[in-house]
């Protein structure tokens, strides 16, 4: 599908009527791409707009480019892969599935993330994350690799604000990191490394 002349409604209508693997080119900020998709694969070139993969329920979305805000909003299952950076509030309230970001994430990534039943959502950020990472996190795994950072912190201000569950892994010595009192911070142990190993391998 050439999305360069389609608004988000027309584009999403075509997606819903095209099962299997679908390649989308010329993406220019169209919203809600893949929202609620249960199966199939979307391969996107360009920049999808807000709420990419919102309510995703099993499909796979891969983006060759950047993505805007709210990637994987309330995601339940499936996988989103972004070969670029993403905007704010990625993984908002996600309760299953996996999001992989090659570059950086904006503010409030992983806000309200939660685990549900046997589902453990995972958000993997290859670069750095903005302020309020893991805000009100209740479950799931956030992993920040900081591969693009050599001198600056890989997480900005106020990480884990209001966090009361889940795990946040940082490839960092933690110097200068200010965490709320309710958050237990420690070096990763063998069990931790085993837990995140599959996500690092997937990345």
Model region roles, listed by residue range:
Residues 1-203:
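Long, distal/terminal scaffolding or interaction modules
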